[in-house]
From Swiss-Prot:
GO terms for molecular function: rRNA binding; structural constituent of ribosome; tRNA binding. It comes from Pyrobaculum neutrophilum (strain DSM 2338 / JCM 9278 / NBRC 100436 / V24Sta). It comes from the Archaea. GO terms for cellular component: large ribosomal subunit. This is Large ribosomal subunit protein uL1.
Amino acid sequence: MSAVINKEALLAKIEEALRRGKPRRFRQSVELILVLREVDLSKPENRINLLVELPHPPKPNKVAAFAHGAFEVQAKNAGVDAVISRDQVEGLSGNKRAIRKLAKQYDFFIAPPDLMPLLGRVVGPIFGPRGKMPEVAPPNVDVKSLVERLRRSVRVKLRNEPVIKVRIGAEGQKPEEVLENALAVLEDVNRKFSLRQYLKDVYIKKTMGPPVKAKALEVLAR
């Protein structure tokens, strides 16, 4: 990634964003916003939905498991924050309010393949647009490793607009840690869209803070 991004320039923008804005009564997140150009999002192949593991997550994500049988035992042993049974899923059918509440409660969900058709019918219409559909856990997967990875990950999406917004840190973290998180996101995006070709602008901002803007040429290595 160092061959593509000017780390010193991006770090300076992160430091500026962390300095700016009034103190708040809560710990603000630090957001990375990428504006792309010349990306035809009418083509499905140009849309992205990635999970990026951050080297320095600002806090562990909450992970819930839709599970039954042996997978339920594995999920509990992996330390998930909640286990939702097949019966509970069926009980959610038609209860949009409860499904929306569940989607807000947890950052990520996991499920075995055999539960996915039921989940698609019951929670899919609400979970899908929110990017909350469960990660499928294949039969031989190390469930504990999967849960640990999800606790450290962020979802990077590009769908209807050529803009990517993702949390890369929080107040109280070292700027260098936020930088390494940003580089992890940029590296994965660069695999799909060459940043040298498609990146237009970069913004760094705290939740309630003013955005710090950088043109692509300012943060791309020369």
